[in-house]
């Protein structure tokens, strides 16, 4: 029986496949090969060079002072490059390859893998997880990356596999060559196509979810990551926030780090955001919702304060006169007197 080799491009995807294989959710002779590096970020000009990739990560991490602890380090990256190439070289002509992708990171990883395999005569299938919608009762779920798939649903996505023919293979390799020639540090999927874009591509999204009053940095990061159709690393968004602070579009308060740091949009940031009318509309809608939420919170807060004052006044009613009670509780004399009518005191 032919062996099926699933090639994926994120740690979360690898975890799902390993679990599915070890628990026999995936039947038959199946394996998983995993590539770690996120080739959608950083320079790939003139090809993938591990030392250049490491240099870029070192620079990126050094500049990104308030980046959280990452899931892997440089040693992990080096080891995975070696492991990945070693496992790819062992692929046999009788093996069937499933290349899984959905996000720009996975798309770039897939192109890199296809470039490595281009001189081999292999049976290759592509699986774009965005092509499958999982329905359960009245809920529909569409994964944006392979890492979002639960092990139990892998077979459903695999059913949408399509065989890679020679013409498409050539087109994908040509696309990879064009991307490598671009002097860009960011690649995203736009209208289903992988493209090089400017490094400030996500700046509008960041500003769109940054309020005019100071708010925890994590809230903005979460909104950008959660509401964007394009999957991007939190490290990259952190770095862009730093750049927006440098250019005066965002102001920060507190120590320059993730935990505890607060940010708000500046007038310069609003001018920049206004260049995108749809983004500005979303920012204004969010601001209105925030004001309404704050109004509700203030209402309940005032109700709580009033209850505390009334409770105190009740306790003092038998020992102090109305004027003194009013002074001590902050209630008016009329409110103190009305306690007798409302509460029978």
Cite the ranges covered by each PLM segment:
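A conserved mid-domain beta-alpha-beta active-site/ligand-binding segment of alpha/beta enzyme cores
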Residues: 141-215, 219
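Short, amphipathic alpha-helical interaction segments positioned at domain boundaries
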Residues: 267-292
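A short, conserved structural fragment
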Residues: 245-256
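A structured, charge-rich N-terminal accessory region that forms the first stable segment of a protein
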Residues: 1-71
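Elongated, amphipathic alpha-helical interaction scaffolds
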Residues: 287, 291-345
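Short amphipathic alpha-helical interaction segments
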Residues: 231-246
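Short helix-coil junctions and helix-kink-helix linkers
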Residues: 222-234
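Long, hydrophobic/aromatic-enriched structural stretches that serve as scaffold segments
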Residues: 64-111
